[in-house]
C-alpha cells in the first residue's frame, strides 16, 4: 500500500472547501481556524501511519516542530498519540491564553534547526507551516530526519511562496516582491507584519522542497496538502505548481 492511499480517500473536494472556508478566520478567530486545522492534521498523520504500518499511531510519540500554543497537542492527544511540541517563540507558546493552561503533552522551547533530541528518538516528526518562517528550512528538515526512528515518518508541510497564501497577512501583495510587500504593509498598518518578509517569512518554492526531499533518498510521497486527490497532479508540473500548490507536503522515512 502506498503511503498516501488511506489519506487520498479523505482528500475530497468537500474537505478542501471546508478548510478554505475556515481560512478566513485565521486572523479574527484563530481558535476556530487552528482547531479545525489541528484536527485535520491529526487525521492526515493517522492515515499516513496506518498506510505504512497497518495500524493507527496510538501510543506512538510525535514531535511537532513549531507546535504553537496547544491546538495540535489536543488533537493528537485525543487521537492517543504522545505529543511533544517544540516552539522557539514564548509568545506563540502562550498565544491561546488561559484556555490552554492544562494542555496535554510536553512542550520544549527550542529551534527546529537545532532540535535538542537524540538521534532516532521519536516515531513521527511533524512540521506544519513552519519551514517558510525559518531562514534554513532544509536544515530543519534534516534535523527532523535525524531525530526520527528508522521506519518512522517525517511529515514536513509548508506554504509555497508563490501560491495565493504565500504572503500570509500581506495578502496578494507578495506577488510584487517580498520586500515591497513588507514595506507596503508597514505603510498601511503602521507596523511590520507578524510574518515579516526577510525576518520571519521567507520565499520557499515547491521546487526547493522537491529537490531537498529527492536528495535525502528518504522520500515516500509529495502532495498538495489542501487539494482534493484529483488535483494532486499539480505537484508534477514545474512553474504551475509554484502558483497553484498552496501548501506542499513532503513525506519521508529515515
Curated annotation (Swiss-Prot):
Enzyme nomenclature, EC number: 2.1.1.-
InterPro entries the record matches: Methyltransf_11 (IPR013216), SAM-dependent_MTases_sf (IPR029063)
Tagged with keyword Repressor: no
Keyword tags: Methyltransferase, Transferase
GO annotation, biological process: methylation
Domain of life of the native organism: Bacteria
A GO term for molecular function: S-adenosylmethionine-dependent methyltransferase activity
Additional notes on this entry: Was identified as a high-confidence drug target.
Family as reported in the entry's similarity comment: Belongs to the methyltransferase superfamily.
Protein name according to UniProt: Uncharacterized methyltransferase Rv0224c
Organism: Mycobacterium tuberculosis (strain ATCC 25618 / H37Rv)
Source species taxonomy: Bacteria, Bacillati, Actinomycetota, Actinomycetes, Mycobacteriales
Amino acid at each position: 500500500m502506498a503511503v498516501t492511499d488511506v489519506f487520498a480517500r479523505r482528500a475530497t473536494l468537500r474537505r478542501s472547501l471546508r478548510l478554505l472556508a475556515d481560512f478566513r478566520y485565521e486572523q479574527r478567530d484563530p481558535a476556530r481556524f487552528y482547531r479545525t486545522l489541528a484536527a485535520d492534521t491529526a487525521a492526515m498523520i493517522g492515515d499516513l501511519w496506518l498506510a505504512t504500518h497497518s495500524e493507527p499511531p496510538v501510543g506512538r510519540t510525535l514531535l511537532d516542530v513549531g507546535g504553537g500554543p496547544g491546538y495540535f497537542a489536543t488533537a493528537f492527544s485525543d487521537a492517543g498519540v504522545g505529543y511533544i511540541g517544540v516552539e522557539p517563540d514564548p509568545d506563540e507558546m502562550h498565544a491561546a491564553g488561559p484556555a490552554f493552561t492544562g494542555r496535554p503533552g510536553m512542550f520544549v522551547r527550542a529551534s527546529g534547526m537545532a532540535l535538542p533530541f537524540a538521534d532516532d528518538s521519536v516515531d513521527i516528526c511533524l512540521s506544519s507551516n513552519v519551514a517558510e518562517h525559518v531562514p534554513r528550512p532544509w536544515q530543519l528538515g534534516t534535523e527532523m530526519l535525524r531525530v526520527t526512528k528508522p521506519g518512522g515518518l517525517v511529515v514536513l508541510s509548508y506554504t509555497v511562496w508563490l501560491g495565493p497564501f504565500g504572503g500570509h497577512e500581506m495578502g496578494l501583495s507578495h506577488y510584487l516582491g517580498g520586500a515591497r510587500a513588507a514595506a507596503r504593509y508597514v505603510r498601511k498598518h503602521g507596523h511590520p507584519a507578524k510574518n515579516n518578509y526577510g525576518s520571519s517569512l521567507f520565499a520557499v518554492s515547491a521546487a526547493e522542497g522537491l529537490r531537498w526531499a529527492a536528495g535525502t533518498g528518504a522520500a515516500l510521497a509529495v502532495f498538495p496538502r489542501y487539494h482534493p486527490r484529483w488535483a494532486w497532479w499539480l505537484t508534477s508540473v514545474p512553474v504551475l505548481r509554484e502558483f497553484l500548490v498552496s501548501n506542499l507536503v513532503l513525506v519521508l522515512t529515515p
